[in-house]
């Protein structure tokens, strides 16, 4: 509302409802519909100027610094009527209060044979996506947290990989490059550059994150008409940016 102070409380409530309420849609269908809203949302009327059906910019893509970015640790979402009372993703990244990234972090120990796969399973559970639970007629997550989701991130030790809400376990990838070069001027917190730093400095930098959402995220049909969400990999993004320049 900082750049659109004309929005009334009623209109803000309506926009909030549009992001959360996607009746009779699968998570992927809801995600695609909400992504369209992130590019072009509308309300009935500008009550100050009288303009009908004005466009509302939920995110300012042209001026990333004008948006509000928050990272919330241990973000709790109550899930009444589900197998567990709540879900608590390790980190959720918000832009203007809209959750775009959900991160699950695991610790390597003797009890976890494959912590990265365990993180993937946890991300599935958070969005009620585990087939065995669905087939049993049970609910264990809150899909609405993922209506606006751009990226899922799983991390353990020095490893860190990203995917989308349709990515299988084998289709999570590391972001292996920091670009532009100006972002390399930082001090790794542990004195060594791990995959976490590469993803944070590269993909999760505010202007890059919003640029990837706006220019490098697509929904497409593949084998047997199955629809998926795809986000570019680091080499594709860098090549595209260099062509534009």
What are these regions (language model features)?
Residues 1-245:
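ATP-dependent helicase/translocase motor core
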């Amino acid at each position: 509302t900082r750049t659109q102070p004309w929005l009334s409380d009623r209109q803000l409530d309506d926009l909030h409802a549009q992001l959360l309420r996607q009746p009779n849609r699968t998570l992927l269908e809801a995600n695609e519909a909400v992504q369209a809203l992130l590019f072009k949302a509308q309300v009935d009327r500008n009550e100050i100027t009288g303009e009908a059906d004005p466009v509302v910019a939920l995110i300012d893509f042209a001026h990333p610094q004008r948006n509000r970015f928050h990272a919330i640790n241990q973000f709790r979402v109550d899930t009444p009527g589900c197998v567990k009372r709540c879900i608590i993703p390790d980190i959720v990244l918000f832009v203007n209060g809209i959750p775009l990234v959900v991160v699950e972090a695991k610790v390597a120990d003797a009890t976890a044979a494959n912590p990265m796969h365990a993180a993937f399973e946890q991300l599935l559970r958070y969005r009620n996506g585990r087939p065995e639970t669905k087939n049993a007629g049970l609910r264990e997550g809150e899909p609405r947290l993922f209506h606006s989701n751009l990226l899922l991130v799983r991390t353990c030790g020095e490893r860190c990989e990203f995917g989308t809400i349709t990515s299988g376990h084998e289709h999570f990838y590391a972001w292996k490059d920091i670009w532009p070069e100006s972002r390399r001027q930082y001090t790794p917190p542990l004195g060594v550059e791990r995959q976490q730093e590469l993803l944070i400095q590269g993909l999760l930098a505010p202007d890059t994150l919003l640029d990837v959402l706006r220019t490098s995220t697509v929904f497409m049909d593949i084998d047997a008409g199955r629809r998926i969400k795809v986000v570019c990999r680091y080499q594709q993004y860098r090549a595209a940016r260099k062509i534009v320049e």
